[in-house]
Amino acid sequence: MSKDLNIWLDDLLGDIENIQFKRKSSRRVRVDVGSEALPALLELLQGRASYVHLSAISCVDWIEDEEFELVYHVWSYETRSLVSAHTRIPREPGVYLSIYDLYQPAAFFERDIHEMFGVFFEGSPDMEKFILTEWDGPPPMRKEFDSEAFVNQHFEWEQYHPQWLKDLEEEGGGVTTRPEDIRL
Amino acid sequence: MRPENYQARSQPPSNEFELNFGPNHPGIEGNYAFRVKLNGDQVLEARADAGYLHRGFEKLMEGRLWIQNIALVPRICVPDPVPMEVCYSLAIEEIGGLEVPERAKWIRVMQLEMSRLAAHLFAFGGHAATTGMYTTMFWGVADRDLILDRFEELTGGRVYSIYNIPGGVRRDVPEGFLDRLSSLLDYLESRLPDYDNLFFTNQVFVKRARGVGAMTQEQALKWGVTGPNLRATGLEFDVRRDDPYLVYDQLDFEIPTESGGDALARNLVRRAELKQSIRILRQVIERLPSIEGPIRCPIPNPLAWNVPAGEAYTRVESSKGELAYYVVSTGGDKPYRVHVRGPSSMHAVQVLEKLALGARLEDIAQIMFSLDACPPEVDR
Amino acid sequence: MNLSELLIELLLMPLVAFVIGLGMVLMMRKIAARLGRRIGPPLLQPIYDIIKLYGKRTQISHGLIHEIGIIMAVGGYVAAETLLPVPGMNGLADKGGVITLAYVMMIPSLGMALGVGQCANPNGSIGISRALTAMLAYDIPFILVIFGAAYVYGTTNLADIIAIQQQQGVSGWGLMQMPLLALAGMLALPAVMGKQPFEIYIAPAEIATGPMVEMSGKFMGGLFVMQCFQLYTAGVLYTTLFLGGGAYWITFLPKIYAVVAIPMAAAMLFPRYRTEDVIRLMWKWPVLVGLMGLAVAMK
Amino acid sequence: MSKLDNIPVRHQPTEAAGRKRTNPLAHVFDELVKFCQSRSMFMLHYCTGCGAIELPPAMTSRFDMERLGIQPMVTPRQADILLITGYVSIKTLKRIILTYEQMQSPKYVIGICSCTVNGGMYWQSYATAKVLKDYLPVDVYIAGCMPRPEAVISGMRELMSDIKSGRAQNWKRYYENYDHYLGNQQKLFGEDWQTPTDIIAEARHYGLMTDRTLGEHTALLEKHQRPLEALEMRLSAREKQKT
């Protein structure tokens, strides 16, 4: 089955240029595709190969490469395999095409990515704020946003410094645990 | 705001009005909100409003060690936390190439099914309460508590066990645990007819739930519905069987389906799954003593553990539907990116908005509870 | 009967009704708890709740009509209690009769509607419109049962009805004389008391407890008091019409508590009906049974 | 952020200002009301965080809170206790404050879970508020992640005994130190943060005005005063964008 799938997918994807194809296990396939060819690939997968279920769209912020990686995980109920289509788009201006016309669940994921990473999806039905309606900072999931620094700047903690902690610190600090007591 | 500024808003006379449904509302599961526009009793438009439970999990996980995140992940879905741990551990094992011992796999399956039982009891107890039948809720939550007792014995935690770690599980099964679990299953099985009589075959409930929030199989597939909600439309699909993980391919169980696709069908599927979970647990109890071996594979010092670079997409079947983790590692001691695909991110937002259209005010809560939507999965 | 005796009775009857009603509320909560495998509230819980609500520092009123509405709700029942004969006290029962009682028992719902309307909370408005619809639903069988009983006894005077039944012992009870009407009354009783499956107008999961949504402090306390009266009135009226009323408190109390306990126990086993199902059910079975009972009674 | 160091944590019960109690039975009535308040606590049915999962067990058959007279209530108008069950995201905190101000005094706040004490395990999260008592006067904290139902009930009993003895007067602090709480709220939500409830007028009504009620932060209320607007509802956004 898995071998057939491989050949079959090879045939299917052969006519798309700029594509790398890698089988990770019998039910997981990784496809690397250029950003311009991705909608066509998904259309092929859905129309000709019964990959009707969009499991998720993940976004990864590769800040050093100045790129966002978008990963479309699609699942076929018939061949029982999952294709992860990876594509990369430049970080600036961070605009890409929506696949809402192919997969309706994309609306949620695209809205979420827009909110968390600031990637705009053209043609998506709803790009309004959803989770972060009361947040006016930068998109928080971008790597340059430092949550800890933000918290230190905006919140104050309870000053908790009880006597037993002071005593411990006088003794040199830290709690000692013998190696045999460490349990996972 | 001063009282003299309270002004009645002048509105054109109309039958239509807007109503905030949540976040502080007993018809909402968790902390979540709806804005609905009604014409009389009928919903014209509905719009979900999430983010009340947003903690920025995915961001937090990027700032913590691989092993620290184990404590973080179960918080993403409170009623059904174990699949979260397992799914995250599976992803790390796939990236790190860890070989999980056989015994650990069986213990994980046991835990997953216990968690499913608990979550389903909670879910239909909640649904019963929205229709005014509090007795079922009292019974369901109390019976769930007995499962939590077994969790406490096994893992030390009632709700959040933090028991699965990459490479296996934290502790072995205590002595006599399987016997106690077995007697608990006997008890639960003897309770099922009571639940049937009280709730699932209660004519008033059947009348209330039939046809509420109904969707066809095509719609369900188009909207990305998964789990029991998809099976209620007649599609026999279960990640446990069709994309097997752990040892589910060695277990014998059925996948219950219903054809109605409405609130009633979804509840009946959950009811049938209770039985299947008990069946799986019995098989585990039978097989587990004969499987010797370690309960986890050796992993490096977890506080200085660099998981090799790679990425993995793992899926498990939680009680709500398909749960998936996408984990990316760049070889550091912390994950580079973790993306959580909670099943409710579909059910609680798009599916609920669509099913609510044309429904009646008294059915919104039923639709939400019958979809078993879990808001923290949306908000993360 | 001289005036001072009447005055004392008028004062005492609502008070007695309130105390018995507190016991009924406690019983209701205990039954719910026992069916849910719980222990339930302590003995004095209903009175704790009411005193606490009246003792709140903030009492938010939404205007005069809001207050009048609650007064009407409680006052309507207080008036009803004086029309209901209990052992040893007849109050106004001789003068009023069962028709006045039926009218007076509608006042609380209308008062609630007024008060809730003033609050301008959409949940409350939806709730009260549902409550009035439910009243429409149960009033048909309710009136039918009352008229049937009055026809059979040949009088609308509740004191006379009790006397007629007691002359003949248990066989003279309305339950024996007109079982169909008694059955119709029993079917309508949960709706009169506002319990499941006929309580969609206070459904918390849909409209956040409907009419009560803006009630707080003493207004909520007023509604708690009203609930005591409501249960008491339903129990006593049914006992008077069909179970021979009471000659002595020692036989009267078990009867009224039993009458209230039966719908209570059934209520915890059912979810709520939708409003239109309430009407359909109420206009179908209790009305049908009641009409048959009426036909049998008229021959 | 202003500090509360110079303010005692628990108030001695003060006589209601401006009203002389001449009735000798007044004391008895007060005691009775206090007792009933401690024996009848309605808690608001609002799951603000993950600690809410331990409330159904505490309410239902196993632990049965109704034994102690505690029962859930649906609207803030009827509730005595606001349970903050776990971390509060900033979006939720706004709703919590609105809810708290709509509750009828005497009212009590219970912070459940470690997250309400100091942010808990979400200490580095940009989306959650850390110290709950900066924004609302908290009567009882129940620590743990998450506290077991027994712990929740024991915390409730603690509050009951506090109410009975008259020590639980923290709701008055909200009126007396409104400027402090409002300042912290404004720091988080922005200068133009306002709630529809007029706390200052209520404080005047109850005779709870102190020199800490008004201050620089309450002055901003006047500055940013705006008419009460209905919550924005953009249902048709989807269609609009499509066209």
PLM regions with names:
Chain B
Residues M1-R380:
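Active-site bordering "gate/hinge" segments
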